[in-house]
């Protein structure tokens, strides 16, 4: 009983701490001497790093943020926790990325970390979701729109992956991750509706 409870709590704490690693903030601070929270969109994610620092740092931040989500799930799996706790660890990583304790609870928008979580939980769903993101991005050149559409597609992708028999925890995380990503993009939605959302290559 104690070992089981300890493992569950450990997975949540590690998930949050992994997610809260401020890779974008650190990259901008070390390479450009700026506080990313005070530049552009104010997000500490890869898109704002791209606009404020450059392509190379943005790619590195993206890969690190993906790794945070995947690692959180894999740690829970290594602890032999059930699907529900693996999912919870992934969501803890998303929460850490969005609300990092180190940065006054102001972080990123959980897109890359959410992708990493999906790759850890069900890699076909993660790849399909990323494919939708890239497809929309290739036509629109708007990262936020691509992220929102990919997030909205997630529950359907999860249902299709398991042919209507998705594990309850997986279906729950699909809806939870969708809600978190869309909620974090609410200011982007306002700009999209107003026609003022910047495209790739434009400053925010």
Curated annotation (Swiss-Prot):
A Pfam family recorded for this sequence: G3P_acyltransf
Function in brief: Catalyzes the transfer of an acyl group from acyl-phosphate (acyl-PO(4)) to glycerol-3-phosphate (G3P) to form lysophosphatidic acid (LPA). This enzyme utilizes acyl-phosphate as fatty acyl donor, but not acyl-CoA or acyl-ACP.
Pathway assigned to this chain's UniProt record: Lipid metabolism; phospholipid metabolism
Lipid bilayer topology: Multi-pass membrane protein
Top-level division of the source organism's lineage: Bacteria
A single Gene Ontology CC term: plasma membrane
Membrane-crossing residue ranges in chain numbering: 12-32, 85-105, 117-137, 142-162, 163-183
Protein's name in the database: Glycerol-3-phosphate acyltransferase
SMART domains noted in UniProt: G3P_acyltransf
Molecular function, one GO term: acyl-phosphate glycerol-3-phosphate acyltransferase activity
Keywords assigned by UniProt, alphabetized: Cell inner membrane, Cell membrane, Lipid biosynthesis, Lipid metabolism, Membrane, Phospholipid biosynthesis, Phospholipid metabolism, Transferase, Transmembrane, Transmembrane helix
GO annotation, biological process: phospholipid biosynthetic process
Coiled-coil parts of chain: none
The enzyme's E.C. designation: 2.3.1.275
Gene expressing this chain: plsY
Protein family according to the UniProt entry: Belongs to the PlsY family.
The reaction(s) this protein catalyses: an acyl phosphate + sn-glycerol 3-phosphate = a 1-acyl-sn-glycero-3-phosphate + phosphate
Chief subcellular location: membrane
Locations listed in the record: Cell inner membrane
Assembly, per entry: Probably interacts with PlsX.
